[in-house]
Design a protein with these regions (language model features):
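Nucleotidyl polymerases of mobile genetic elements and RNA viruses
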Residues: 1-164
Length: 164
């Protein structure tokens, strides 16, 4: 967008110190090893050994099959979920519950929640920064660990949709 017209059109800039980046990278390297075991086989993006293109092909096959269905009495359907700005909406309490339910240890849960909740925001108004304020939800965009935390939360949605 060339000229933003609403606050929602702005995207935050992720500024982290070197120590945070090192800690985050170490945690990501450990999380990567677990993701294939923790995440549903239907989630293919960003999981080692899986390919996102598999889901694209599957989606095309499903749509093609739905178009060919002649039995209108049975309920067939497809659902497309718009994940727009979903990083900003991840509940920290939900994330903590997900981590605990997936048997992450107290040390890991505490460290991850420290990473998530340590961010602050400030706005530039007429070139001058405002006072900082603290968010109560969301994960940092551009932070490598945020991707994996988001996948863990989105996996719960995937499971709920599958189970009906």
């Amino acid at each position: 967008m060339v000229v933003p017209e609403e606050v929602s059109h702005f995207r935050p800039i992720n500024l982290c110190n070197v120590t945070y980046k090192i800690i985050s990278k170490i945690m990501v390297n450990k999380l990567k090893l677990l993701m294939a075991k923790l995440i549903s086989p239907y989630q293919n993006a960003f999981i080692q050994g899986r390919n996102i293109f598999d889901n694209i092909l599957l989606a095309h096959e499903i749509i093609d099959t739905l178009k060919k269905k002649t039995d209108r009495k049975k309920g067939y359907g497809a659902l497309k979920v718009d994940m727009c700005k979903s990083y900003d909406r991840v509940s920290w309490n939900f994330l903590k519950t997900v981590l605990i339910s997936m048997s992450f240890g107290n040390y890991w849960v505490h460290r991850i929640m420290e990473c998530v909740s340590s961010m602050q925001y400030a706005l530039l108004l007429n070139g001058s920064p405002t006072h900082t304020f603290l968010p109560t939800r969301g994960v940092r965009q551009g932070d490598p660990i945020s991707l994996y935390l988001f996948l863990l939360c989105a996996n719960i949605l995937s499971i709920a949709l599958i189970q009906g």
